[in-house]
A protein has these predicted regions:
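Extended, low-polarity transmembrane helix blocks
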Residues: 253-324, 339-354, 360-421
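Conserved Rossmann-fold NAD(P)-dependent oxidoreductase catalytic core, especially the SDR/UDP-sugar
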Residues: 72-74, 84-128, 132-134, 138-144
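N-terminal Rossmann NAD(P)H-binding glycine-rich loop of SDR-like oxidoreductase domains
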Residues: 3-23
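Mid/C-terminal beta-alpha module of Rossmann-like enzyme folds, strongest
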Residues: 190-252, 266-301
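Conserved glycine-rich Rossmann-like NAD(P)H-binding loop of the short-chain dehydrogenase/reductase
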Residues: 25-32
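A conserved pocket-lining segment of Rossmann-fold NAD(P)-dependent short-chain dehydrogenase/reductase
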Residues: 159-178, 182, 186-190, 194-197, ...
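NAD(P)H-binding glycine-rich loop region in Rossmannoid oxidoreductase-like domains
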Residues: 36, 42-92, 96-98, 110-114
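Flexible, glycine-rich beta-alpha linker
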Residues: 118, 139-156, 209
Length: 421
């Protein structure tokens, strides 16, 4: 079958792409950049649903496509952006499919149509309803929380999993998570056994789990025992999510808090009745993900960044305040006095402050880490040449820079690239 896979660079799209290609299907894959994994039998095209919503002629429908799979989704709290991409952009895509006689699988989300106060779900539901009213062969697949390597929610959960005490927004709401392998298998089941009429199918795991129960399953898969959980008091959670709304945080905002406090459940038998497929228990899928060493690295990374920020800002404050005279005495030891010494101490403090701030901005983080490496090496070289006695400090103040060098290098090498999908 010739399939148009939209959103092929996303978490779900990447897994679908590889499996459908391995099954022998001819694929036209899209991303905003028009680039992605180079696989035999896969052609890449550029498609931006924001532009398609404004101009349906933005995208030329590929010849011979029999099935459209829409795997796009936007992690956003901006209701206008969600309506543009997930509703109007999807509608324009469905119109193209209808005009060209293609069937459609719409990957929606469990809860769409039932929680209109959640912009993410409301925009999905609007597109779902439009598709079902077009009169084309269509299936709206509404999966629960999908887990597996590379997913945003999966990364957040794996980052939480190593800690023995875990604070959560809610500890009682239940969901039915499933593994990405089961979502892919469900799509394959639809291709083998297409429903007679356009329909909505919930896709859920067989077990209803609270977030602590889910995290304990992930911990067990990595060799840890159960953790202890602390529900964040509303007096702390509510102001925090309002701040998240203002700053555009994806992991902490009003939408996330509302979802975290609600059950999101469905009948696992509905999918089985339609396609004879049912998702496996999550525990049976936790083989290659999560991986203990990656979870620990992801968990400690923000802690290490925060510590480095505090160190750089701390040295800046000390040099400008209580340690200023000490800094001048050190400059005198290398023969620098007067205004030049004061400029050197103040300039060094300001440089430290700027580098600490650079760590907080993702777009500047790589540059800041490289500059930190250069600055620390320069400091150590100057000390080695002109102030070698500082190497013999009983507290190892200079020698400890070796640890900071390694930590900074690790952060630089593991800093994720920002790609345009």
């Amino acid at each position: 079958m010739r399939i148009l896979l939209v959103g092929a660079n996303g978490f779900i799209g990447r897994h679908l792409l590889r499996t459908l290609q391995a099954e022998g299907h001819s694929l036209v894959a899209t991303s905003r950049s028009g680039r992605g994994a180079e696989l035999p039998g896969v052609a890449w095209l550029s498609l931006d649903l924001t532009m398609l919503a404004a101009d349906p002629s933005h995208f030329q429908w590929p010849q011979g496509v029999e099935l459209l799979i829409n795997a796009t989704g936007v992690l956003s709290t901006d209701a206008r952006q969600l309506a543009t991409v997930q509703d109007r952009g999807a509608r324009a895509l469905f119109d193209l499919a209808a005009d060209n006689g293609a069937s459609v699988i719409q990957l929606s989300a469990l809860g769409a149509g039932e929680q209109p106060d959640i912009p993410f779900l409301a925009s999905k539901a609007a597109a779902d309803d439009y598709l079902l009213g077009l009169g084309v062969p269509a299936v709206v697949l509404r999966p629960s929380l999908v887990l597996g390597e590379g997913g945003a929610s999966s990364q957040w959960l794996s980052r939480l999993s190593p800690w023995p005490l875990i604070p959560l927004l809610d500890t009682w709401a239940r969901a039915q998570p499933l593994h990405i392998e089961d979502l892919v298998a469900a799509v394959l089941a639809l291709l083998r056994q297409w429903p007679a009429q356009p329909c909505v199918l919930p896709l859920v795991g067989p077990d209803a789990l609270t977030l602590p129960e889910l995290l304990d399953q992930l911990r067990a898969a990595q060799g840890w025992g159960p953790a202890r959980y602390l529900q964040i008091p509303a007096a702390i959670a509510n102001p925090a999510v309002r701040l998240g709304d203002r700053l555009g945080w994806r992991a902490l905002n009003t939408q996330v808090l509302t979802l975290a406090r609600r059950d999101n459940l469905a009948d696992a038998q509905a999918m089985k009745a339609a396609t004879d497929f049912m998702a496996a228990p999550l525990t049976s899928r936790l083989n290659e993900w999560p991986r203990r060493e990656l979870s620990v690295a992801a968990s400690l990374r923000p802690v290490l960044l925060a510590v480095l920020v505090l160190i750089w800002w701390g040295t800046a404050v000390v040099c400008l305040g209580p340690g200023h005279e000490w800094g001048l005495r050190i400059m005198a030891e290398v023969g620098v006095h007067g205004w030049l010494a004061r400029m050197a101490v103040v300039g060094g403090a300001l440089a430290d402050a700027v580098l600490g701030a650079g760590l907080l901005l993702r777009r500047w983080r790589r540059h800041a880490l490289r500059a930190q490496l250069a600055l620390m090496l320069a400091y150590m070289l100057i000390i080695s040449l002109w102030l070698p006695h500082y190497w013999f400090d009983p507290f190892g103040a200079v020698a400890k820079n070796a640890v900071l060098l390694v930590a900074t290098l690790w952060l630089l090498w593991t800093e994720p690239e920002v790609h345009r999908r």
